[in-house]
């Protein structure tokens, strides 16, 4: 929809107070307490006149008050110009005053940061909110220009832990908006604003949509994440594919488990899992030729039981699923190491793997990580466990007896 351009008014801090920068708050976002804001940050050296004025002011204060140690004054002038937001004017002012102290730190880190802040909602109501903020340096074509500029992207949500759990999703979303920031700095209404207004729907609610679309078959995605199996989504809805990809990323164990060993050490034990095919049928997503372990089925049941409790509860269940897997994996690696010299530890490893509900996945991840097969004795223990557990799956329980020769 075409918009009428207005002359923007800038205050001394670089704040663009034109009405065109602010969108109307949607009833849904106001009800959730979720908002967004985008700023253009500018940092430039202070002029000689500004520095001289500050020096004179400081001298006057010193002559009137006792001498006290003060931090050195910054030699740069910082400002934030509002580009787009759906916050009210008072709340936006709170946010801008909060951010001006954070941007310099954000520019040193490409990741996003989450902080709590006091924000005014309505005329007199003040409460604590969480703010995700991420800065992207703006490239300048003028190499001799001394000022530094950056885009600052902010998402506001209640202080309930949502932004912390979905921080990685917000970082990826922010980076995906960078081309829109650089190409649409003037007209946000037709491009960037539409994406920003959906940030909560895109970055947070995908968990609910996946659980709703897969129902109990969400266990297949959990299994694929543990097995690191590729997932191919065939659907005419690009949002479905994006949701599945984000859910798989949320379920993977990257960054939680030990680093894998070199390719030479694990090549003999690595297996490439078969790809999972997902298609859309009758508004449901169906996984073809895919099974899930009892362990993943139990965690899928927890997700289904809590499907109406909101994205925060669902994400906590996913995080619990990952933590339990890491704990079990560490236990298996410890027992296998002890079993190299202790038959009782071998028995304990066998009993645990038999009852855990996903022994094949745990052992394969341990093999891929490399430490359990780093020695001939460790390789022998793993081979024996795999042999006995496979036999048990077919013909009932058998007690493993390690060849002591």
Question: At which residue positions do the language-model features occur?
Answer:
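N-terminal uDENN/longin-like adaptor modules and analogous extended polar/low-complexity scaffolding regions
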Residues: 2-238, 397-400
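A eukaryote-biased sequence property
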Residues: 2-21, 37-41, 55, 207-211, ...
């Amino acid at each position: 929809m075409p918009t009428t351009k207005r002359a923007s008014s800038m205050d001394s801090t670089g704040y663009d107070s034109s009405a065109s920068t602010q969108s109307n708050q949607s009833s849904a976002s106001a009800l959730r307490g979720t908002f967004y804001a985008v700023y253009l940050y500018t940092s430039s050296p202070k002029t000689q006149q500004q520095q001289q004025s500050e020096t004179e002011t400081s001298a006057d204060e010193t002559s009137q008050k006792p001498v006290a140690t003060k931090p050195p004054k910054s030699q740069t002038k910082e400002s934030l110009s509002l580009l787009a937001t759906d916050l009210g004017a008072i709340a936006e002012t709170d946010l801008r005053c909060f951010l001006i102290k954070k941007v310099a730190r954000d520019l040193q880190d490409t990741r996003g940061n989450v902080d709590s802040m006091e924000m005014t909602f309505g005329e007199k109501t003040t409460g604590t909110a969480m703010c995700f903020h991420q800065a992207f340096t703006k490239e300048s074509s003028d190499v001799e220009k001394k000022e530094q500029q950056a885009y600052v992207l902010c998402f506001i949500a209640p202080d309930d832990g949502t932004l912390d759990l979905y921080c990685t999703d917000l970082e990826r979303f922010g980076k995906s908006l960078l081309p829109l920031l650089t190409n649409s700095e003037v007209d946000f209404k037709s491009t960037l604003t539409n994406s920003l207004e959906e940030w909560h729907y895109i970055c947070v609610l995908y968990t609910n949509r996946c659980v709703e679309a897969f129902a109990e078959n969400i266990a297949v995605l959990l299994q694929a994440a543990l097995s690191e199996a590729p997932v191919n989504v065939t659907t005419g809805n690009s949002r479905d594919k994006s949701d599945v990809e984000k859910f798989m990323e949320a379920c993977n164990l990257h960054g939680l488990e030990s680093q894998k060993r070199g390719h030479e050490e694990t090549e003999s034990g690595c297996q490439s899992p078969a790809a999972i095919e997902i298609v859309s049928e009758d508004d449901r997503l169906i996984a073809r030729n895919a099974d899930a372990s009892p362990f993943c089925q139990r965690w899928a049941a927890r997700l289904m039981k809590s499907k109406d409790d909101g994205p925060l509860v669902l994400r906590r269940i996913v995080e619990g699923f990952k933590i339990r897997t890491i704990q079990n994996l560490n236990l298996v690696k410890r027992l296998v190491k002890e079993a190299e010299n202790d038959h009782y530890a071998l028995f304990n490893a066998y009993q645990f793997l038999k009852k855990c509900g996903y022994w094949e996945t745990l052992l394969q991840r341990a093999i891929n990580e490399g430490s359990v097969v780093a020695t001939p004795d460790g390789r022998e223990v793993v081979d024996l466990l795999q042999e006995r557990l496979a036999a048990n799956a077919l013909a009932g329980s058998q007690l493993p007896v390690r060849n002591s020769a």
